[in-house]
């Protein structure tokens, strides 16, 4: 935990929110049925990311410059939680605000540095809306059209993005991490958006979940960022207090988008989760499922972040 004389990440974010006079944005997530909250992992920080091994092959190097072979149907994406991004709807405008902050940190003057194009989306516990957020952030940027996006399912739990999009029988992230010689291009799935591709979690998640904390997975994630420097790589990762995966992957990414469910997630849960991922240089907090009255206008919405 942080020393008494040093404000916690969430306290710094709250101070910024109050100072700016803003109200956190409310994104209406389609929550999945509840699951039990697993006990928090040990409070110890994950070890520093080891340097890449010179002899290890680049697991993303074999990806061909061709379009993905399979396409996800738009209706299936909508059923999986894709919101209407057209027009001036509140949710579309809110995701445009979120994407502006993420893209500025990734490619703009406020770049977060190395691997800033790698964005991990997570939360404290299940059903706070992280998968909804990851899917709609990726789609919002793809609709904009000036940046390519790779949406990666890095959650080995059942009910993940791959399940929602009908990709649970497809090879993906886990297979590539286990076998760097596997062609990444074979695993990429196309979408109705020309600039958006999806990498499923893979078929081995039932018995290869340990790969998320392995050096091969960390090398793979960073290789994706190094190879696709012109695109944003959005990783939908399991909740911090359900598994140690986010703590391990936080050292490999340049940004974390941390989803907090309004009026439900406890402060101590948020603090415990943030302590586990503070190895990432830039952490953005997004308050989700806020109940707004009809008198609120779009201009009152914002979100807090800490870095």
Predicted regions and their residues:
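C-terminal lobe/tail of nucleotide-utilizing enzymes
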Residues: 1-95, 211, 268-307
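Phosphate-binding loop that captures ATP/GTP phosphates
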Residues: 140-201
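A short, flexible beta-alpha/helix-coil linker loop
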Residues: 126, 158, 203-206
